[in-house]
Amino acid sequence: PRKTTAPKPTAPAGPATATVTLPTANEQFDYQIGSAYTLPKNVRVVSRDRTAKPAAGLYNICYVNAFQTQPDALDWWEKNQPDLLLRDGSGAPVQDEDWGEVLLDTSTAGKRERLAQIVGGWIDGCAKSGFQAVEPDNLDSYERSDGLLTKQHNAAFARLLAQRSHAAGLAIGQKNTTALLPERKTIGFDFAVAEECGQYEECEEYAAAYENRVYVIEYTDTGYGRACAGWGGKLSVVQRDLDVSAPGGSYRYRAC
């Protein structure tokens, strides 16, 4: 990526009380959701956790785990909102075992409204901290729900988050989940954050849907090579280590 034109304000989809600024396509990107650190040279767009500070002078995307619990937050949910955790027939929380996270229950309108109050508070916090956009993670949690959640449950919740984001003056990114690309406008998504679209040959779908406003993270050499060869001139493509760690140890970052 070499473009340096400033992001242009655009009218958001759905209700809004503030101007939303979209990220510029094909600017150099870094994915710092594991730990914030000094930015590599030429980076203009960065994604950081909602608890981190945004980078001065850059376009900052705020990472929010909106559809699952953070591993260290499960006790809070169990104590304060136990019925918002998705549970199986025996009453046990349904887990994303790869990451040690419990799925949030988006299956009813009432629960979605309550979840939107909680996650919406985080989104408002992103705006107050100075971020320009939000990426709600685990939009695809329904795929790990053993049939207890559907694509439409999560789309309906994402719509509430898009409305809250736009009202706070934040753009909102679709995180993965090509199955929901046809509903992107109904939901209100503005751009995409796509993990491993090179690895799984999905970059073209995101690029077409979002006019190249796609921020690609690859974790393998193969995926990075494919994404760069096919899309490095149009999309923002980086390779990170799976733990998205700070420099040192397993840290890896490169961009094309």
Model-derived features: positions:
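Glycan-processing catalytic domains of CAZymes
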Residues: 9-256
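Secretory targeting and sorting signals
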Residues: 1-4, 10
